[in-house]
């Protein structure tokens, strides 16, 4: 069992989850960007792993790296910038690095190409160590995700699966809302809906998709030649090549012109390849033991997440639009054909000549119209209303006579009034008064009038006060009458 697991572990390739790959790729890029390539580490785990693998397998030989051959003169012309360090560190570094050029003086040690190459190789090893650690973290996280998916599949957890799908769809919706452009909103909504439909809702997929999912992703190892893939595979996995540089950018001793291409010195790429293989074997062994102990037969029935097959997005509005566009195009084509036909002048044909003359049928002649007297309904009604009209005319005549008579009498009355006024307006002399008998007016025998208060409507609550005042007023009036009589 252990031997089979080890064999499988050696040929094991990293299988990534397509859904969680984007976030993991971001983590890899973050680790690779933040790592310091100028930091020198003298003892690396890559060297240890390569030595251990070489000791175990004496027949094992490192794969020759396909290096880009460049002349040594170019390397000599390059200027390697070395940062100034403390004197103690410089001594330690010079002691640790062996110079092959024979320049052992301090002045020549700084300008030596061998030392510069070794420092670059050490920084490169550390850079790929950090990257390998990030890749291992991604593999562990993908395994955890797969275990979680298995628990979701084998347990009665349909609700959790639905909640996961809802969260993913909400994230896609938020991204679509944040990235709504000013123009082309309908197209943007269609694309967002297509993204939503891309999530796997059913477990039924085609066999071709299952085969594509089960195929392991071909990770490009550093220093290895890229295998030839078909166009479809290159379209699907173009992102895998972005993690590692091309073979032209690899810094090795043969590239720098220090050693021959088939030399025995192994580069950092060989160490990284051997360490990756050894780590992969350990991880595969550990995973196989854990699966056989804890999970049992669950690994055999494991199902990977199936990618939904994309189908074209169809709308009834688009179908209607196409139909209308076709009809409109047909109408325009017919109109253009009709206009073209109308532009062509049609010649008038000559009359058909015959030996015998044609006897054309004469049209039917209409008879002479006989005029008929008009019978108007208004004339008939006028005969019936003759008596009424006569009575109306008599009344109108009487009214006119009455008006004329009244006007005549009014004129006579006005004339008489004018005559009377003329007579009265004639001035007459007034008689002279008699001064010997002056007029002396006599005293009247009537009693003077006694004034009385008016009787107003007095309310009940004011009667007492009013009565008291009225009694005094009565007595006063009575006394005034008595005094007046005495004076007379």
From Swiss-Prot:
InterPro entries documented for this protein: TPX2_C, TPX2_fam
Q: What induces it?
A: Induced by ethylene (ACC) via PIF3 binding to its promoter and subsequent transcription regulation. Accumulates upon submergence through ethylene signaling. Repressed by aminoethoxyvinyl-Gly (AVG), an inhibitor of ethylene biosynthesis. Higher levels in light-grown hypocotyls.
Q: Does the keyword Translocase apply?
A: no
- Using the UniProt record, give the first listed, main subcellular location: cytoplasm
What this protein is reported to do is described as: Binds directly to microtubules. Microtubule-destabilizing protein involved in the PIF3-dependent positive regulation of hypocotyl cell elongation via the modulation of cortical microtubules dynamic in response to light and ethylene signaling. Promotes submergence-induced and ethylene-dependent underwater hypocotyl elongation.
Single Gene Ontology MF annotation: microtubule binding
Specify the protein name: Microtubule-destabilizing protein 60
Q: Which PANTHER family does the annotation name?
A: MICROTUBULE-DESTABILIZING PROTEIN 60 (PTHR14326:SF54), TARGETING PROTEIN FOR XKLP2 (PTHR14326)
Q: Where is the composition biased (Polar residues)?
A: 25-56
- Which Pfam families does this UniProt record tie to the protein? TPX2
Q: Which region ranges are annotated with the description Disordered?
A: 25-71, 262-304, 436-457
Annotated Gene Ontology cellular components are:
cytoplasm; microtubule; spindle
Ranges of biased composition (kind: Low complexity): 264-280
Instruction: Note the superkingdom of the native organism.
Output: Eukaryota
> Any idea where this protein resides?
Cytoplasm, Cytoskeleton
Gene encoding the protein: MDP60
Family per UniProt? Belongs to the TPX2 family.
Q: Please name the GO terms of the biological process aspect recorded for this protein, alphabetically.
A: cortical microtubule organization; microtubule depolymerization; regulation of mitotic spindle organization; regulation of plant organ morphogenesis; response to ethylene; response to light stimulus; response to water-immersion restraint stress; unidimensional cell growth
Q: Which UniProt keywords apply?
A: Cytoplasm, Cytoskeleton, Developmental protein, Microtubule
* Effect of deleting the gene: Reduced hypocotyls length in light conditions and in response to ethylene due to reduced cell elongation and associated with the disruption of cortical microtubules. Suppressed effects of submergence on hypocotyl elongation and cortical microtubule reorganization.
